[in-house]
């Protein structure tokens, strides 16, 4: 009897394939309790056995290592699940491949933004829905006269396709969308109610209302994953502010051969800068950014007010809406960094100083922004609208003393927030 250790994180639908197969075959699978995704699978010991660092990964009791979820499921299955003839074996492989090529990519494109782990793209999601429709219709036609995908019993084909459909049926395939696929629904419900399947996935609830992309959830996820990245040098609170280092223009990196995705992006027409429709005015954003980077604030702030063109540029105050949910300060900083990365194309015509005030579990995020135009700039492009709704925005009067005080505070990284929390860290968008 097959026995061994399965490395995976909780609720991994890919690992479900092997775990369900083991329920049918009697294979003894032990889930590695000490496994920590992002740490264990990056360790030298793990990479020695599984060079790509992917999970699920399986190590048999006699020391053999197997990667890739379908291969692991096949290994721990019995002959009934694998097919009773060469034809059935081939048909099972066909449906396993169908799941990986026709369902999984489109499922990820549609569902992952809903879960907050991938950025939403309207066109890509529309294509994904069309692809899922085609895949479900193919399944529905095949199951019109069949109880299972291959033969008269449950096989790996049913297990693998069911596991690949779990996220869709859980998060986005509401009743209105799935009602056209009567045979597929019947088959799916039959599978998830098998005792061997329920032993792994538990009680499964079909989607009632299709999930939607939530910018706040996405921003929080980006902050969480960004916490493991190497921190960039940041300014720290100080009595005497050190002169900022001069920002050098990086040399062009050595070019590498572009992959298919890069080639496709390169082939797309260049997008037009939304700011081009607005008057340029007299304020030279690049000039101010250079002056700010190379001079103390005692010089750069007066320089800002001397050059600022209030007729063609505006100043805004931003405040993060969900401050009671902020935890670690470094995660708050990652929220800011993530937003800056996602609005990269605004950088040429905008400047911002965004600060974290307070300490762990008692902090706030707020900032001062300057950009060309008199309206909220994020509405100019769908690409800039991922994060801004997580903030309250207030347009400031450039002639008001309150505005001048705020600009000084945020450009010098000093003072407190509205609740009296002291400045902790700041980031500059320039």
UniProtKB/Swiss-Prot annotation:
<dbReference type="InterPro" id="IPR036433">
    <property type="entry name" value="EF1B_G_C_sf"/>
</dbReference>
<dbReference type="InterPro" id="IPR050802">
    <property type="entry name" value="EF-GSTs"/>
</dbReference>
<protein>
    <recommendedName>
        <fullName>Elongation factor 1-gamma</fullName>
    </recommendedName>
</protein>
<keyword id="KW-0648">Protein biosynthesis</keyword>
<dbReference type="GO" id="GO:0005634">
    <property type="term" value="C:nucleus"/>
</dbReference>
<feature type="domain" description="EF-1-gamma C-terminal">
    <location>
        <begin position="271"/>
        <end position="430"/>
    </location>
</feature>
<comment type="subunit">
    <text>EF-1 is composed of four subunits: alpha, beta, delta, and gamma.</text>
</comment>
<feature type="domain" description="GST N-terminal">
    <location>
        <begin position="2"/>
        <end position="84"/>
    </location>
</feature>
<dbReference type="Pfam" id="PF02798">
    <property type="entry name" value="GST_N"/>
</dbReference>
<feature type="region of interest" description="Disordered">
    <location>
        <begin position="232"/>
        <end position="278"/>
    </location>
</feature>
<dbReference type="InterPro" id="IPR036249">
    <property type="entry name" value="Thioredoxin-like_sf"/>
</dbReference>
<dbReference type="Pfam" id="PF00647">
    <property type="entry name" value="EF1G"/>
</dbReference>
<dbReference type="Pfam" id="PF00043">
    <property type="entry name" value="GST_C"/>
</dbReference>
<dbReference type="InterPro" id="IPR004045">
    <property type="entry name" value="Glutathione_S-Trfase_N"/>
</dbReference>
<dbReference type="GO" id="GO:0003746">
    <property type="term" value="F:translation elongation factor activity"/>
</dbReference>
<keyword id="KW-0251">Elongation factor</keyword>
<dbReference type="InterPro" id="IPR004046">
    <property type="entry name" value="GST_C"/>
</dbReference>
<dbReference type="InterPro" id="IPR036282">
    <property type="entry name" value="Glutathione-S-Trfase_C_sf"/>
</dbReference>
<dbReference type="GO" id="GO:0005737">
    <property type="term" value="C:cytoplasm"/>
</dbReference>
<comment type="function">
    <text>Probably plays a role in anchoring the complex to other cellular components.</text>
</comment>
<feature type="compositionally biased region" description="Basic and acidic residues">
    <location>
        <begin position="269"/>
        <end position="278"/>
    </location>
</feature>
<feature type="compositionally biased region" description="Basic and acidic residues">
    <location>
        <begin position="232"/>
        <end position="255"/>
    </location>
</feature>
<feature type="domain" description="GST C-terminal">
    <location>
        <begin position="85"/>
        <end position="213"/>
    </location>
</feature>
<dbReference type="InterPro" id="IPR040079">
    <property type="entry name" value="Glutathione_S-Trfase"/>
</dbReference>
<dbReference type="InterPro" id="IPR010987">
    <property type="entry name" value="Glutathione-S-Trfase_C-like"/>
</dbReference>
<dbReference type="InterPro" id="IPR001662">
    <property type="entry name" value="EF1B_G_C"/>
</dbReference>
